[in-house]
């Protein structure tokens, strides 16, 4: 038996700009504009850049959504 636990690979660990746009209900270009102007919403983590494209960690985005939804309910 191995002491290592393999991650769940059924979902990608990374979220593209287009996927993030669908999740937070904004257009992809709006997110690109925020990145260009360095004006990401408070709490949204900076993306990783891979081959010139921006990718967010799924865990970070889910944490942002959880935090955002808690704030709105207050």
Curated annotation (Swiss-Prot):
Query: Which SUPFAM superfamilies does this chain map to?
Result: Putative DNA-binding domain (SSF46955)
Give the source's domain of life in one word.
Bacteria
Return the InterPro entries for the record.
Answer: DNA-bd_dom_put_sf (IPR009061), EF_Hand_1_Ca_BS (IPR018247), HTH_17 (IPR041657)
- What is the induction comment? Expressed at low, approximately equal levels in exponential and stationary phases (at protein level).
Q: What is this protein called?
A: Protein YkgV
């Amino acid at each position: 038996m191995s002491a290592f636990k393999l991650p769940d690979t059924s979902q990608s660990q990374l979220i593209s700009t287009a996927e993030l746009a669908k999740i937070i209900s904004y257009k992809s270009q709006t997110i690109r504009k925020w990145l260009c102007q360095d004006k990401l919403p408070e709490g949204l983590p900076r993306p990783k850049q891979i081959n010139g494209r921006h990718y967010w960690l799924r865990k970070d985005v889910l944490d942002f959504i959880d935090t955002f939804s808690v704030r709105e309910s207050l």
